[in-house]
């Protein structure tokens, strides 16, 4: 959890926002997936948001569903994902690592056991995409017991009560949703919602990172100009993996070429 605090403090000092890429662990296979993560970090990623392949991803658009299918085709299991997480943590001791999950994967393990496993692997945060704030108590309590930040999604239509709950329960960062719907770079993010950012600050919420539909540097800049602490990009990155699926070296070069200008856009 503390890794997020250190990161945001460091970035604030440098007058920068955070650029956070999302990929699915094990896509397109374990070895290449680890190389992808190294390439993202080398190109300037400030933190990582990682998915564990799951058979029924509700909030994911087709791009990320395909990533899940590729990981399944490579035979990747949740247990192997945790081995990967431990390797990533060993190699990159300071970068914040977040998981984007679905509740079934947490239930399969047992809630407490799942968060204990996260702590052991060096995971900093977990966002359970299909658990609404009002049902989150067992998840967030287990998370805090194991020094894992519970992350909450702040939707564009959040009312005051929800904003207060998110501010009160969330740690690490707040996932600020650009718009409702499924993920995807085709659906470009609408401009960030300044009033939400203002309210979240007022209620002392964890720093907001804007996600969903972030696929170009100007959107990263717009998110930060509106007061977000940074931006998360997933589908646009996963699409690059898909486009270069048979050219592993080209894939890594293309990922770096995408991340560098996205990170550059976080510098005021």
Curated annotation (Swiss-Prot):
Residues the record marks as active site: 49 (proton acceptor), 60 (proton acceptor)
An example of a GO molecular function for this protein is: tryptophan synthase activity
Name the EC number(s).
Answer: 4.2.1.20
The record's keywords, sorted A to Z, are: Amino-acid biosynthesis, Aromatic amino acid biosynthesis, Lyase, Tryptophan biosynthesis
User: Matching Pfam families, A to Z?
Assistant: Trp_syntA
| Cystine residue pairs | none
**Keyword ATP-binding, does the record have it?**
no
Q: Which domain of life is it from?
A: Bacteria
Report whether Lyase shows up as a keyword of the record.
yes
Question: GO CC terms for this protein?
Answer: cytosol
Q: What is catalyzed by this enzyme? A: (1S,2R)-1-C-(indol-3-yl)glycerol 3-phosphate + L-serine = D-glyceraldehyde 3-phosphate + L-tryptophan + H2O
Q: In which pathway does it act?
A: Amino-acid biosynthesis; L-tryptophan biosynthesis; L-tryptophan from chorismate: step 5/5
The record's subunit annotation is: Tetramer of two alpha and two beta chains.
Q: Which family does it belong to?
A: Belongs to the TrpA family.
Its function, per the record, reads: The alpha subunit is responsible for the aldol cleavage of indoleglycerol phosphate to indole and glyceraldehyde 3-phosphate.
* Stated name of the protein: Tryptophan synthase alpha chain
What is the scientific name of the source organism? Escherichia coli (strain SMS-3-5 / SECEC)
